[in-house]
């Protein structure tokens, strides 16, 4: 199987929006970390601060419903998750 060194994916955060309002952004960041760890069999997942800020850009209780991320391999079972920025 081909190694996933640089991978782009869309993570759906609608399940987070159905929960209670307080602490939604924190739960959303934990959910992103859990999804990436599950898909890539990672021991450590590093979240870019720009991604965390874009998830909660409308406040801590109003998270976005979907987020497009780029997952890059940094080391042995260590992955960096960044916000995917479209280039025109």
UniProtKB/Swiss-Prot annotation:
Keywords, in A-Z order: Ribonucleoprotein, Ribosomal protein
Transmembrane segments: none
SMART domains: Ribosomal_L31e
InterPro entries named among the record's database cross-references: Ribosomal_eL31 (IPR000054), Ribosomal_eL31_dom_sf (IPR023621)
Matching Pfam families: Ribosomal_L31e
One of the protein's GO biological processes: translation
Annotated GO CC locations: ribonucleoprotein complex; ribosome
HAMAP family to which the protein is assigned, alphabetical: Ribosomal_eL31
Protein name: Large ribosomal subunit protein eL31
Name of the gene encoding the protein in the UniProt record: rpl31e
């Amino acid at each position: 199987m081909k190694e996933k060194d640089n991978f782009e994916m869309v993570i759906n955060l609608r399940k987070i929006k159905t929960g209670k309002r307080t602490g939604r952004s924190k739960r959303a960041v934990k959910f992103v970390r859990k999804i990436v760890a599950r898909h890539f069999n990672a021991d450590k997942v590093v979240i870019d601060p720009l991604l965390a800020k874009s998830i909660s850009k409308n406040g801590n209780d109003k998270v976005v419903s979907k987020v497009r991320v780029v997952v890059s391999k940094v080391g042995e079972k260590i992955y960096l998750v960044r916000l995917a920025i479209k280039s025109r």
